[in-house]
Design a protein with these regions (language model features):
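Extracellular repeat turn/loop positions enriched in glycine and acidic/polar residues, especially those
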Residues: 8
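Solvent-exposed beta-strand motifs enriched in subsets of small alpha/beta binding domains
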Residues: 184-228
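Active-site-proximal helix/loop segments of hydrolytic enzymes
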Residues: 2, 11-13, 19-190
Length: 228
């Protein structure tokens, strides 16, 4: 099974940030990274990213990539906002395309339920919208709004690594339930751990290593720089 994770927007998308300056993409990309690690523990699952830490990937590029790879599921991760200033808008909501395709709606309902149970935030329900990533994708697609950046209490959560992990785990649980995914055996996990570590280098300048790390992360690899 092929799953594409879409961390909405980018570091430089205009307006997609909290009133005090947190970029939405900061939350979105971390949740996507946690989800990728969790999903790869299931049999037959391959995870792709539509986004990049290096550049702002257009909506069309994202959906074109998903369609070209013929992924089975597309999940767009977001933090919500109401206006540009602080307000009391709150809660979590999950979207499907406006025609409400049954398969996407069922997935959205499972994801929404797990997010509400895991976070305790207000349940804003499953809704429909004409978002590009839902309209232009040819597979089961949902878009999740994990709390409001314009609500000061929820912004504190969105900044928390624990909350980001909680959201990732809840979304993955919904995906697992919907597609009836099975965990890999301990032997498979051990084999995966030992076979897919690649060391690239050395580099004499740290900047060069970090630039390559950024490119690798942008195409979906878990990359890091080690000194010594």
């Amino acid at each position: 099974m092929k799953i594409m994770l879409d961390a909405g927007h980018s570091y430089n998308t205009v307006g997609k940030r909290s009133p005090d300056g947190m970029r939405e993409y900061e939350f979105n990309r971390v949740v996507a990274n946690y989800m990728k690690a969790l999903l790869e523990e299931y049999e037959g699952v391959t995870v792709y990213f539509s986004h990049s830490d290096k550049k702002d990937v257009s909506l069309q590029e994202r959906t074109d990539k998903a369609n070209q790879l013929a992924v089975d599921c597309f999940v767009s991760i977001h933090a919500n906002a109401y206006g540009s200033g602080w307000n009391e808008a709150q809660g979590i909501e999950t979207y499907v395309y406006k025609t409400k395709p049954p398969e996407a709606t069922k997935l959205a309902e499972r994801v929404q339920k797990n997010l509400i149970v895991a976070t305790g935030l207000r349940d804003r329900g499953v809704k429909s919208a004409n978002f590009h990533v839902l309209r232009a994708t040819k597979m089961t697609a949902i878009l999740v709004e994990c709390g409001f950046m314009t609500n000061q209490s929820e912004l504190q959560l969105l900044r928390s690594d624990l909350y980001r992990k909680t959201c990732a785990e809840a979304i993955v649980k919904g995906i697992r339930e919907h597609f009836q995914l099975k965990l890999k055996s301990p032997d498979q996990l051990q084999k995966q751990e030992s076979l897919f570590h690649v060391r690239i280098g050395p580099f004499f300048e740290k900047k060069q290593a970090e630039e390559l790390m950024t490119r690798l992360r942008g195409i979906g690899y878990e990359a890091s720089v080690q000194e010594g």
